[in-house]
Amino acid sequence: MSPLETNPLSPETAMREPAETSTTEEQASTPHAADEKKILSDLSAPSSTTATPADKEHRPKSSSSNNAVSVNEVDALIAHLPEDERQVLKTQLEEIKVNISFFGLWRYATKMDILIMVISTICAIAAGAALPLFTILFGSLASTFQRIMLYQISYDEFYDELTKNVLYFVYLGIGEFVTVYVSTVGFIYTGEHATQKIREYYLESILRQNIGYFDKLGAGEVTTRITADTNLIQDGISEKVGLTLTALATFVTAFIIAYVKYWKLALICSSTIVALVLTMGGGSQFIIKYSKKSLDSYGAGGTVAEEVISSIRNATAFGTQDKLAKQYEVHLDEAEKWGTKNQIVMGFMIGAMFGLMYSNYGLGFWMGSRFLVDGAVDVGDILTVLMAILIGSFSLGNVSPNAQAFTNAVAAAAKIFGTIDRQSPLDPYSNEGKTLDHFEGHIELRNVKHIYPSRPEVTVMEDVSLSMPAGKTTALVGPSGSGKSTVVGLVERFYMPVRGTVLLDGHDIKDLNLRWLRQQISLVSQEPVLFGTTIYKNIRHGLIGTKYENESEDKVRELIENAAKMANAHDFITALPEGYETNVGQRGFLLSGGQKQRIAIARAVVSDPKILLLDEATSALDTKSEGVVQAALERAAEGRTTIVIAHRLSTIKTAHNIVVLVNGKIAEQGTHDELVDRGGAYRKLVEAQRINEQKEADALEDADAEDLTNADIAKIKTASSASSDLDGKPTTIDRTGTHKSVSSAILSKRPPETTPKYSLWTLLKFVASFNRPEIPYMLIGLVFSVLAGGGQPTQAVLYAKAISTLSLPESQYSKLRHDADFWSLMFFVVGIIQFITQSTNGAAFAVCSERLIRRARSTAFRTILRQDIAFFDKEENSTGALTSFLSTETKHLSGVSGVTLGTILMTSTTLGAAIIIALAIGWKLALVCISVVPVLLACGFYRFYMLAQFQSRSKLAYEGSANFACEATSSIRTVASLTRERDVWEIYHAQLDAQGRTSLISVLRSSLLYASSQALVFFCVALGFWYGGTLLGHHEYDIFRFFVCFSEILFGAQSAGTVFSFAPDMGKAKNAAAEFRRLFDRKPQIDNWSEEGEKLETVEGEIEFRNVHFRYPTRPEQPVLRGLDLTVKPGQYVALVGPSGCGKSTTIALLERFYDAIAGSILVDGKDISKLNINSYRSFLSLVSQEPTLYQGTIKENILLGIVEDDVPEEFLIKACKDANIYDFIMSLPEGFNTVVGSKGGMLSGGQKQRVAIARALLRDPKILLLDEATSALDSESEKVVQAALDAAARGRTTIAVAHRLSTIQKADVIYVFDQGKIVESGTHSELVQKKGRYYELVNLQSLGKGH
């Protein structure tokens, strides 16, 4: 049970609300602080602790993390509830456990897929049957050889017989080519197609799940499932199925032939097959178990990686890359442990199989000699039976390397199909429920009780009844965690209330069709999520499912532009070089917060919805935009039902009804004037936010406590559009005399098209470097691989000896028995040696392979964290793409280690030893046979090359589609509220379709070469028999010499063929190695690991910007700072204000040295920061940003991420927490500092998360404190307290604060007003108000008085 889960009846836990995601608003701050208690003193409600399980736009939590609640725990936690309430919670959390059989992997195969598979199966079986048929020809030729050696037939008769049999071999070869080609292409095609269907069904299922289900899922988990796990399935149902069927067909056909020839001998030899099956069955059980545990650990690691990469600015600012990497490595170590066990079991299983096979030969040969002496069978039949058993058993050895792929596929599918089979209780795809032809939009909550499924022990809303009349605006206010966002979640039907009803025009919304309901509602959240496409398409998403969806393109464009104008976004959009076609980047990161918010508002109003939900819709805007957008929203709200949640009370004064929520209950409601007159909680909230303007009473005589008139709005709109027009004009920066830094010169160009190419040898050395510490294991593995590879050539000699022993005449039967006993014993000895060598080689390479994967993942993760911020701004380095790279590509690296490497070495030894023995015993025949081997190798190499090309092409397509799926699922609330589920699925489907088409051509070409390499074995055999037979006919060779040369080369060549069945793994490995090498070779312009530059001992805190010009590397055409000059004296508190997109946050980013300026210089204490040691410099800075970043782990661990050291005195920690006003709250939790915060801090509210982030910043005791809208996520109460804490913390250090809420910065020593990347005004609050310039206008807009 998570530490936050305590007695549901205790006052501390009386109310903990799982937060919203896109509705982060509060997410639960606790009114423990004295100030907060005072403000709510009129209310007799108990003090509450509210914790919530979601953050920002939904990033689901990891099921493997501590905060996930298991079903059994849920049962215990909800035991005190009535049965019907328990049922509501359980249906929202229920998980399906599915048992998948291997054939279940094809559950989505189409009729065409099945037809292709049937044909491919027939061909694979036919291909496998070809080799055993050779034993019949072999028996026939053996007797022919015996007759020519005894001079029983003439040379001509012999030659005719020989030619006829050799031609049969050629026909078999042609048949083999056709069947192998068809089966390989067929299985790769159906494998890809079936996996595509699984990917599509999985995404569809994820999109139809209820939001409560996501509250316990890790963000990295969906990415891992849709990339790594589906790749495992594809690996298990593609060409390896064909290879396995072929091997099994060889086995079965060979044994049928053996039984027909002489069943007694065949039966005795078959006894070991039972032992083989038992060995495989027992081993597979362990393999599945260990494989699943390893996958689970990698999934948990994926979630950590996703959390860290998605908040890279925070990790960089605090220099905590090493600590975070260690957290990631904990999961990697766990995965390595289970992975190693898995591989060791596999090694022992293969060793046992080889040991049993060789023992089988010894047994068969020994019994055969007895039957021969008894006269029950002749030499030819024994040879056919033994040859058939040899080939059959050998082919069974080819099955085992694929067994792992099949078991992994089944393990991966179990989780994926579990999600696919889950019936969502709130299914947006469902057609159930009625739709209303006409409705007014009257919303009513009647006796609603709500409990979040992921926090079942806490009641967040108790018996709330609230009427929100049609066409009116209802505002919800109250402290963090009071249940405001819960109302939004219930109206959108993200959750089901456990009791009571939510009504729309008197209809219970659970009787209405879910998709239809959401299409009538538009939601704008505090932290808007845009999708990685153009502005135009983002706004157009608001039309999905509405009556305007299928309008003409001209009409749609008109609607979109009107919506943008209404949201005050049209001007800034048209000022962008590409206008509405500008790509906003993943989650809209290329736009400022205010710009994103305005596009989100445009998206919400474009469909003219009947119901509008505004969850702090203007909190991310600066005052100027807010005033205009607020007026636009008020205009948009006319005639429709609007629910507004606001921390800034100035935005809701005009609401028809204001509802004050505290502790999940309604404290009071009424209009602004009524509530202020009443003097209750609302009045105190208003006073907390009032800007202190007494000193400027004269200056503000006319403007005090007034709101904007329409004329003011029009004036500001004109001003804002006029100023925005400047953006449209190309700004030339005169760079004469300025030195453009290397980084900006490089960054301002588009990424180069060419990527470095590496030779195979370079990549092999590179991969080997990961295994340097395992050299002893590697050497053991290599030595034992060589020994294991010697088994087959030894067996060929033993086999030839067996044939010559069995050919002894009756007069030498006593010698025959003696020799038979000896050679049989030799087979048994070889079997024991094979068991030891195969097992040891498997275990040694298991250690190497798993450590390689762990080390590669760890190093890659650390290298990613080393990169500069510009690297993460690029589309190809999005969170999804990098998380996918870590999970998938590292797995591929093992294609040149472990089992593959061992098998290749073993095969090389087999081939080498076979050639040497053959040359020593009969060089003429050996040379003829060897001549074909280079052709075999060339075919295999070319196939390897083809697959590497195919791999690099397909990787891009899958990465793009996986990234798209990750973006959609991590923004699930936005997708759900826009009813974009089908749209998302269709885009994903189209991306996968395109990938399927490109890969097919590549598969057709590469399979041609693979089939050739298989067929050449038969031509090789034909050539060997023909030439060897000729030598026998001329009595140059005896039977022993012929069979040694022939067996050595035959099986040697077949081994050479099997090496290339590993070509797909090697192809993937080569491509992955190149990707890794490219990443490791990338030297960031601002290197977080760099030891260069001057290290600072102390910092006074004087800051100066001199004529700084800057453009973001991803948008070089868009100037951001245009000659910024700014001075901050040591210890000053400086505030930056201005419209969104004017360069305030950019100034903070440049000070943190996330980027380098294009021109000009930034000085701290008179030193250019680009010349300072980066880590030394950053250690004197602390950053608190608008969106607080917490990681999975405890509160204490999160606060300690503020410093590099692991140990810090307890009193420092406590002081930082007290300064941030979070200490009392932490102490009120049952687990105190050891409380788990959940994925991305989701168990805490926005206000609580922000205060933990502030404590983390203060723990560093920074000389320079950077506050980027540090209090914007807080409600008035928390903000007042935290602001006081920040004011106190700012004493004695230089502080730069970016703020939209002017009440937070009126005491600043200097306020700089930004516009268009320059400073237009500066001075103190009172000086600037007296100037009556731009700042005065902003103050006026935010003034909080009584209503109109």
Swiss-Prot record:
One of its GO terms (biological process) is oligopeptide export from mitochondrion. The chain crosses the membrane at residues 114-134, 168-188, 240-260, 268-288, 344-364, 371-391, 778-798, 825-845, 892-912, 925-947, 1015-1035, 1042-1062. The keyword Ribonucleoprotein does not apply. PROSITE patterns: ABC_TM1F, ABC_TRANSPORTER_1, ABC_TRANSPORTER_2. PANTHER family: ATP-DEPENDENT PERMEASE MDL1, MITOCHONDRIAL, ATP-DEPENDENT TRANSLOCASE ABCB1-LIKE. This is ABC multidrug transporter atrD. Signal peptide: none annotated. Residues 1-10 have a biased composition (Polar residues). Residues 443-688, 1103-1341 form the ABC transporter domain. Glycans are attached at N99, N314, N550, N877, N1088. The keyword Transport applies. It is found in: Cell membrane. It comes from the Eukaryota. Residues 118-408, 779-1068 form the ABC transmembrane type-1 domain. SUPFAM superfamilies: ABC transporter transmembrane region (SSF90123), P-loop containing nucleoside triphosphate hydrolases (SSF52540). ATP binds at residues 478-485, 1138-1145. Pleiotropic ABC efflux transporter involved in the protection of the cells against a wide range of toxic compounds. Confers resistance to the azole fenarimol via efflux transport. May also be involved in the secretion of penicillin. InterPro entries: AAA+_ATPase (IPR003593), ABC1_TM_dom (IPR011527), ABC1_TM_sf (IPR036640), ABC_transporter-like_ATP-bd (IPR003439), ABC_transporter-like_CS (IPR017871), P-loop_NTPase (IPR027417), Type_1_exporter (IPR039421). It holds the Pfam family ABC_membrane. One of its GO terms (molecular function) is ATP hydrolysis activity. It comes from Emericella nidulans. GO terms for cellular component: mitochondrial inner membrane; plasma membrane.
